[in-house]
Amino acid sequence: MKKILYAAAMTALMASPALAENIGVSMAKFDDNFLTVLRNGMQDYAKEKDGVNLQVEDAQNDVSKQLSQIQNFIAQGVDAIIVNPVDTDATPAMTKLAVAAGIPLVYVNRMPSDNPLPAKVSFVGSNEVDSGTLEMQEVCKIMGGKGNILVLMGELSNQAARQRTQDIHDVIAKPECAGIKIVEEQTGNWDRTQGTDLMTNWISSGVQFDAVVSNNDEMAIGAIQALKAAGVDLNKVIVAGVDATQDALAAMKAGELDVTVFQNAAAQGSGAVDTALKLAKGESVESMVWVPFELVTPANMEQYLSKN
């Protein structure tokens, strides 16, 4: 009789669905066009996987709140944690928490400052050396290697902003772009409104420029709005951004944005979940999982219209 009951129990266990994988996700903030696409990419991918549950939290651009969310995920005993860092300089503390708890950790989109990453910790994103380089090389080409540019930087606490800005400096240091001069360089914190405000101030100050090179599309769109409000002929100004968001591509289609760089937010999102699941199962993954950047111009923009 015991053998029959044991066999029945084993049959029922084998017929039951696999144990659910619970993943805690802390996003830097929800109120951001690009990060919304990234978050949707995670959630859409998770829906395709049986038994995968995502608990997605908004850190509201607050490092303390993000650390608290990670601590809560650990207390809940999640199988893995995904973090889109508010401040990439704060990642060593986050890594320490996850490693001490023995929980796999995946950083997404914003590269952590930890180097190298310990076991069971990975980064999924795009190589920022490529983003600003592709952007500025195209701007240099359009400008014929000479002229004045304005640079809109993202949040300075963010590795992506620092690297994209460095990329711009590296490109104009090359002989073919040596005639290009940066006349203003300020942070707009990735924000469209701040991009508008900075551009308005530069126009009012009488700064002479030929191009606006932004660390992201949101600030570039803000600059475009300010240029239009001031009656500046956009055919005489080059505007460039990074991300290839839907709003940016609409601006490009309207002839207002000249250059952007496609950052595959959805692929980063799905890649982060896939990497977290593999780590939770004890599988081996690369510490750096790269999703390539791609240059977008009016000549090839049509193929990107439905991607971000």
Label each region the model flagged.
Residues 3-5, 13, 19-308:
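A residue-level marker of the well-folded mature domains of exported/periplasmic proteins
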